[in-house]
């Protein structure tokens, strides 16, 4: 894996965006608001369960997975939302996976991609996403705010991903309601769960917070549970022998 992981991804995204056309807006898929759900269900650490066939750091993870069956298992075992990788080149995802899953589940769905343009946002919404991902490290603050406001104007919720204190401060400044702390450094691709613990001391009351990456066991989940509303988990679920059991293991009771 290149040390310049994020710039490599963004260069590819620029090429993809140049080929996209702005789609006509389709009706927004109806489900509950993730923010409201996380605010009103704080007795448990909520799980955002990811459908991910591969990644740059892990290579192929589970290429033969039945994506709809996997998503339904997540939903049946209490996942708060399903994250669907739509990046083709680096994660072997596809926008069609989001479309398929969104028609088969009732809970919110996250379009997991490196979004840099309004055309990607509309495409994700039309494919069934109710939440999109915006990564602070991928965008200048003014552009991040533009895309955030555009997405919310279309009825979408936005997971704003951060990795360090300056990025967390940006997320707070733009008024993000759902903030992710990625324990993976998108430049070196190394993970450290302490990233979540350190940044949690700077949290505010209004947003909800999601810890992302480097969470594989109930013990990992328990470390962040006192400070976070939820966790985003992909690899641990995609490689689990018993997916239902793994989801339950990660749902830490917060009392």
From Swiss-Prot:
Pathway: Amino-acid biosynthesis; L-tryptophan biosynthesis; L-tryptophan from chorismate: step 4/5. InterPro entries: Aldolase_TIM, Indole-3-glycerol_P_synth, Indole-3-glycerol_P_synth_dom, Indole-3-GlycerolPSynthase_CS, RibuloseP-bd_barrel. Pfam families: IGPS. This is Indole-3-glycerol phosphate synthase. It comes from the Bacteria. GO terms for molecular function: indole-3-glycerol-phosphate synthase activity; phosphoribosylanthranilate isomerase activity. One of its GO terms (biological process) is L-tryptophan biosynthetic process. Coiled coil: none annotated. Keywords: Amino-acid biosynthesis, Aromatic amino acid biosynthesis, Decarboxylase, Lyase, Tryptophan biosynthesis. Belongs to the TrpC family. HAMAP family: IGPS_B (MF_00134_B).
């Amino acid at each position: 894996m290149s040390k310049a992981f994020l710039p490599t991804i963004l260069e590819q995204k620029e090429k993809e965006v140049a080929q996209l056309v702005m789609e006509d807006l389709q009706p927004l898929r109806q489900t509950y608001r993730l923010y409201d759900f996380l605010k009103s269900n704080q007795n448990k650490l909520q799980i955002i369960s990811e459908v991910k066939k591969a990644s740059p750091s892990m290579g192929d993870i589970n290429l033969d997975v039945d994506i709809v069956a996997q998503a339904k298992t997540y939903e049946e075992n209490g996942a708060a939302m399903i994250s669907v990788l739509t990046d083709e080149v680096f994660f072997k995802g596809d926008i069609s996976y989001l479309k398929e899953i969104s028609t088969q589940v009732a809970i919110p769905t996250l379009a997991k991609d490196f979004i840099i343009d309004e055309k990607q946002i509309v495409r994700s919404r039309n494919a069934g996403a109710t939440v999109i991902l915006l990564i602070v490290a991928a965008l200048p603050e003014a552009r991040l705010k533009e895309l955030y406001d555009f997405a919310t104007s279309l009825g979408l919720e936005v997971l704003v991903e951060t990795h360090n204190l300056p990025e967390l401060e940006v997320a707070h400044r733009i008024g993000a309601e759902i903030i992710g702390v990625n324990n993976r450094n998108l430049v070196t691709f190394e993970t450290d769960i302490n990233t979540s613990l350190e940044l949690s001391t700077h949290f505010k009351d209004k947003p909800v917070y999601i810890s992302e990456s480097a969470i594989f066991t109930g013990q990992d989940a328990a470390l962040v549970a006192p400070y976070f509303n939820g966790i985003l988990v992909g690899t641990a679920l995609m490689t689990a022998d018993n997916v239902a059991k793994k989801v339950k293991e990660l749902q830490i009771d917060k009392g």
